[in-house]
C-alpha cells in the first residue's frame, strides 16, 4: 500500500469522523437538547462532537492498521502484531486521559470529581444548610442511636439506603424531611420530639 493510498484512508477517517460528529451536533438541537447551566449552548455539544470525533477517528486508524498488518505478515509477525496493538491502545488511553482532564462529574460550584476518593470527600463534607435545629451541648448520641435502630430498621436496614440518604437528603440538608416521611408510615410510632432526636443522630453520626 503506497503513501497515496494511506493518505486517502486517513482523509476518509477524518471526513467520516467530522460528518458523524456534525450529525450528532445538529441532532442535539433538533431533539430539544438543553445544556448544563454552567456551560454555553455551543460548548457542551461541541465537547460531545470532539468525543465522537476521537472515537470514530481512533477506530478508523485501528481498522487501517490491522488491515495493513494483515497484508504484511512476515516471520516477525509474532512480535510486530502485539506491539502494534499495545501502541494503539496506549495512544487511545493517553489521548482520552489528557483530553478529558476535567472529569465527567461537575458539582454546583463548578468543581470536577475524577476519582472515588474525591467523591467520598465531597459526600463527607457537611451540608451547607440543614432543616434541623442546632445540636444541644448535652445531646445523648448513644440513646439517639438506640432509638434510631429501633425505629428506622423496621422496613429495611439503614445500611441498604445509606448511599441514597447521604446523597439525596443529608447532602442537601433535608434529614428532617426524610424522618418526617418515616413518621407518616403506619406503625412507625415516631413522635415529633423523636423526629428531632433521630434526625440529629443521622445528621451528625450516620
Curated annotation (Swiss-Prot):
It is found in: Cell inner membrane. SUPFAM superfamilies: Cytochrome c. The keyword Zinc does not apply. GO terms for cellular component: plasma membrane. Signal peptide: none annotated. GO terms for molecular function: electron transfer activity; heme binding; metal ion binding. Keywords: Cell inner membrane, Cell membrane, Electron transport, Heme, Iron, Membrane, Metal-binding, Photosynthesis, Reaction center, Transmembrane, Transmembrane helix, Transport. One of its GO terms (biological process) is photosynthesis. The keyword Acyltransferase does not apply. It is a multi-pass membrane protein. Heme binds at residues 152, 155-156, 182. Binds 1 heme group per subunit. The chain crosses the membrane at residues 10-30, 49-69, 76-96. Monoheme cytochrome which is the immediate electron donor to P840 of the photosynthetic reaction center complex. Component of the photosynthetic reaction center. The reaction center interacts with the Fenna-Matthews-Olson (FMO, fmoA) complex. This is Photosynthetic reaction center cytochrome c-551. It comes from Chlorobaculum parvum (strain DSM 263 / NCIMB 8327) (Chlorobium vibrioforme subsp. thiosulfatophilum). The lineage of its organism: Bacteria, Pseudomonadati, Chlorobiota, Chlorobiia, Chlorobiales.
